[in-house]
């Protein structure tokens, strides 16, 4: 009953008239925006890079096909491509508590180190490159279509005209000014989308 209720299924979009009457959302007129947990952020990158194969519904899950997901890394102690340190660094940076002590609510602090992580750490760079390779492997797409696919895959929505224009400007900068190849240019763009609030927050 709860998950099918109108309250639970609300959008997090801001309505000025309602916000003026209930700025703190005490009456739940919109869905409260919340940041994804550390494990969900990591698994999202993993899935976008094509590292979590789809499995048929109606059958027991084969966990061996999802062994690189965060929950299995944390319980088994193994990690893909020898990046265990970077994965644990990410999980701790975004609020995962390795102590195992139960808490009623995780720390959802926002800090500069998190922003720097998306741009400088080799873990998101690796998965951004894998996603760039997936995008470039899709046949018969022009740049505008490829940008739209990228945004839909990563944040679940198409870019508006101004954002599309800014994206083309950035891609041209990567290609011409920085003299990067196609895969590297698209990987840089994907890193920028990874670092956006639209990727980290559930609306």
Task: Indicate residue ranges for each PLM-predicted region.
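Amphipathic alpha-helical segments that form the core helices of the histone-fold
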Residues: 154, 165-176
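An acidic, gly/pro-interrupted, aromatic-rich
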Residues: 1, 7-158, 188, 193-203
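Short, well-structured alpha-helical segments
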Residues: 148, 160-168
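Short, charged, surface-exposed loops that flank catalytic or proteolytic processing sites
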Residues: 141-143, 176-185
């Amino acid at each position: 009953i709860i998950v099918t209720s109108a309250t639970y299924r609300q959008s997090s979009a801001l309505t000025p008239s309602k916000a003026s009457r209930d700025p703190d959302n005490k009456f739940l007129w919109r869905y409260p925006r919340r940041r994804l947990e550390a494990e969900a952020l990591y698994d999202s990158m993993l899935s976008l890079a094509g590292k979590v194969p789809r499995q048929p519904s109606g059958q027991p899950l084969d966990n061996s096909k999802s062994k690189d997901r965060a929950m299995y890394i944390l319980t088994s102690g193994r990690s893909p491509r020898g990046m265990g340190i970077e994965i644990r660094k990410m999980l701790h940076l975004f609020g995962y508590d390795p102590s195992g002590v139960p808490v009623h609510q995780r720390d959802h602090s926002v800090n500069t180190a998190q922003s720097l992580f998306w741009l400088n750490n080799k873990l998101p760079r690796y998965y951004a490159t894998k996603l760039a390779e997936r995008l470039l492997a899709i046949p018969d797409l022009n740049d505008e279509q490829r940008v739209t696919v990228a945004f839909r895959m990563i944040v679940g929505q198409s870019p508006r005209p101004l954002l599309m224009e800014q994206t083309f400007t950035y891609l041209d900068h990567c290609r011409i000014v920085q003299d990067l190849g196609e895969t590297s240019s698209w990987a840089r763009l994907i890193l920028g989308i990874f670092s956006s609030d639209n990727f980290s927050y559930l609306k």
